[in-house]
């Protein structure tokens, strides 16, 4: 019942295709060989099909055609010279009489109850020298009966091998076009039967229509050119690509003309050394900075067990759950707790083995990285402010013990941070921070320096006071007589070598020197009136003579 009442599929095919017998398989193999030997590659099939449909519609405007849509194609195969396709899209005609492989496809009208007349040899006797497959569309006559427009493909097979070899060379039929042939050196100059592209493969690279990705067009990445002068041009067109080596636009890091940068350290981000030679590396056991005399006093990590998450490799004060509990917190203070406890998801996968049913920290197979122990991704409980305060106090006590024993070295400073610290800042803030950031050993040295500075200042003040007393004992200028109306007394002039004179700014000094000149003029006027000071009078006479 599977084959419509026929015993075998061969009998069903014989009845379907109206063949007398299916014992001769040579005809089918020859047809298959000839069909596969003439393979045509199409590029723009949509445009070609639209053109054919448009031409079919134009030819159909002259007459009305009647066709049955549900009628199946009937293929007639026989040992005679004609093979017909009735009510189908194509008619294929094969013959073994002529000399070459030829192919023609024609659109013509096929009547419902007519047979094709004439031998296929007579149809192509005048076209033996053609090189390509031709497609001719013939318009039907207005007096013909109603039918359908179909295509006819006629393939003629040669009988002699010599004619086949000579004509195939003239028709550009290479050995690669035939099934079962090996690759030939002459296959470079191949003219493909490509619809929509009439260019050969071996044409220049500028003439080949290659397809370029849209991402490559947007990036506009240029290959590295052979000449060196092109790489140094500052007006290159490709400006939207940034180099990771020199941070300039226009090229990639592999095409950069500058030498490659040295790889930075993953611990301190400085260049010139790697992780194992870094001065800021830390101990994996105690997490303290390592030095030449460092000795780790902590227990091995596989002997540590956390009282908080019950995992191996750390203690409760270093549990990753401490920072994981802040996943909902956005303000300073204790961590925010969720209103409803989050349940575990139904889909559980392992990041270590990739299997379903368990998490990565529960996996019993070998780990990909053995330097650290796995941790739990869940939060068992949230800390309140009292527990946070207790943990901070424990950490401070531990830091004091390390400082007391000398196990905690000085803080490592990067070179760029040290250069930033050397910039001028406010004297008060720098002095306060300088006092607070010093260690006890350095405080003793600073105290000695401050004591010596204070002693020097005291000696300067003592010398200034002695000079002031000498001026009072031996006056060199006239004394100003105080008037009864003024209660203010003039202060004695300070000597020029006083220490406070150098500490004042320059503008104040200039203004005060100007005032001193005015006071001297007034004193000279007063001295002329009173003849008490004879020494000044003698000096004036000498100056006037000179």
UniProtKB/Swiss-Prot annotation:
**A biological-process GO annotation:** nuclear polyadenylation-dependent snoRNA catabolic process
Basic and acidic residues composition-biased segments: 402-429, 440-458, 504-514
**Subcellular compartments:** Nucleus, Nucleolus
Specify the domain of life of the species encoding this protein. Eukaryota
- Which parts of the sequence are CCHC-type zinc fingers? 241-258, 263-280, 304-321, 348-365
- Record has Iron as a keyword: no
Q: Name one GO cellular component term.
A: TRAMP complex
Keyword Repeat appears in the UniProt entry = yes
In this chain, the stretch annotated as Disordered covers 52-71, 402-546
| PROSITE patterns found in the cross-reference section | ZF_CCHC (PS50158)
Q: Where is the composition biased (Polar residues)?
A: 59-71, 430-439
Supply one GO molecular-function term: RNA binding
Q: Where is this cross-link: Glycyl lysine isopeptide (Lys-Gly) (interchain with G-Cter in SUMO2)?
A: 131, 139, 141, 239, 254, 339, 413, 435, 488, 491, 494, 538
Q: Which Gene3D superfamilies match?
A: Zinc finger, CCHC-type (4.10.60.10)
InterPro entries, per this entry?
Answer: TRAMP_AT-DNA-binding (IPR051644), Znf_CCHC (IPR001878), Znf_CCHC_sf (IPR036875)
- Basic residues: bias regions: 490-503
Q: Which UniProt keywords apply?
A: Isopeptide bond, Metal-binding, Nucleus, Repeat, Ubl conjugation, Zinc, Zinc-finger
Record's Pfam families?
zf-CCHC
- Assembly behavior: Component of a nucleolar TRAMP-like complex, an ATP-dependent exosome regulatory complex consisting of a helicase (MTREX), an oligadenylate polymerase (TENT4B or TENT4A), and a substrate specific RNA-binding factor (ZCCHC7 or ZCCHC8). Several TRAMP-like complexes exist with specific compositions and are associated with nuclear, or nucleolar RNA exosomes.
Cite the PANTHER family for this sequence.
Answer: ZINC FINGER CCHC DOMAIN-CONTAINING PROTEIN 7 (PTHR46543:SF1)
* Protein name per UniProt: Zinc finger CCHC domain-containing protein 7
């Amino acid at each position: 019942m599977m084959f419509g009442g026929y015993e075998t599929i061969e009998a069903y095919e014989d009845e379907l295709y109206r063949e007398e017998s299916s014992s001769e398989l040579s005809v089918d193999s020859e047809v298959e060989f000839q069909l596969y030997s003439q393979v045509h590659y199409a590029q723009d099939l949509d445009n070609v099909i639209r053109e054919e449909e448009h031409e079919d519609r134009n030819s159909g405007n002259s007459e009305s055609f009647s066709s049955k849509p549900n009628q199946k194609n009937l293929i007639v195969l026989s040992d005679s010279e004609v093979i017909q396709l009735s009510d189908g899209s194509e008619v294929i005609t094969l013959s073994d009489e002529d000399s070459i492989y030829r192919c023609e496809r024609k659109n013509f009208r096929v009547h419902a109850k007519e047979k094709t007349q004439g031998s296929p040899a007579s149809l192509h006797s005048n076209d033996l020298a053609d090189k390509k497959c031709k497609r001719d569309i013939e318009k039907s006559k207005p007096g013909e009966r109603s039918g359908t427009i179909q295509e006819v493909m006629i393939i003629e097979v040669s009988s002699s091998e010599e004619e086949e070899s000579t004509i195939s060379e003239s028709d550009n039929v290479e050995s690669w076009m035939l099934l079962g042939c090996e690759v030939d050196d002459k296959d470079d100059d191949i003219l493909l039967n490509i619809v929509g592209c009439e260019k050969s493969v071996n044409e220049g690279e500028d003439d080949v229509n290659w397809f370029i990705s849209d991402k490559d067009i947007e990036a506009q990445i240029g290959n590295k050119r052979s000449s060196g002068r092109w790489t140094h041009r500052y007006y290159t067109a490709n400006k939207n690509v940034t180099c990771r080596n020199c941070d300039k636009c226009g090229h990639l890091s592999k095409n950069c003309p500058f030498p490659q940068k040295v790889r930075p350290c993953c611990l301190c981000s400085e260049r010139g050394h790697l992780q194992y030679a870094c001065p800021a590396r830390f101990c994996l056991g105690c997490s303290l900075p390592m030095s030449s005399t460092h000795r780790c006093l902590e227990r091995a990590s596989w002997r540590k067990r956390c009282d908080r998450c019950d995992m191996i490799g750390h203690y409760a004060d270093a549990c990753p759950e401490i920072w994981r509990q802040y996943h909902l917190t956005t303000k300073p203070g204790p961590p925010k707790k969720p209103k409803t406890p989050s349940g575990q998801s139904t889909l559980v996968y392992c990041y270590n083995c990739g299997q379903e049913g368990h998490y990565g920290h529960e996996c019993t197979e070998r780990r990909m990285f053995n330097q650290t122990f796995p941790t739990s991704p869940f939060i068992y409980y949230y800390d309140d402010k009292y527990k946070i305060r207790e943990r901070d106090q424990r950490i401070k006590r531990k830091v004091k013990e390390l400082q007391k024993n000398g196990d905690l070295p000085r803080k490592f400073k990067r070179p760029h941070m040290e250069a930033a610290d050397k910039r001028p800042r406010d004297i008060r803030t720098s002095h306060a921070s300088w006092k607070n950031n010093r260690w006890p050993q350095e405080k003793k040295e600073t105290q000695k320096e401050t004591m010596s500075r204070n002693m020097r200042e005291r000696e300067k003040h003592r010398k200034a006071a002695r000079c002031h007393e000498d001026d009072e004992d031996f006056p060199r200028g006239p004394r100003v007589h105080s008037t009864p109306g003024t209660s203010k007394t003039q202060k004695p002039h300070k000597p020029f070598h006083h220490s406070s004179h150098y500490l004042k700014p320059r503008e104040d000094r200039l203004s005060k020197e100007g005032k001193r000149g005015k006071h001297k003029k007034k004193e000279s006027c007063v001295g002329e009136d009173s003849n008490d000071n004879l020494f000044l009078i003698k000096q004036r006479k000498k100056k006037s003579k000179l």
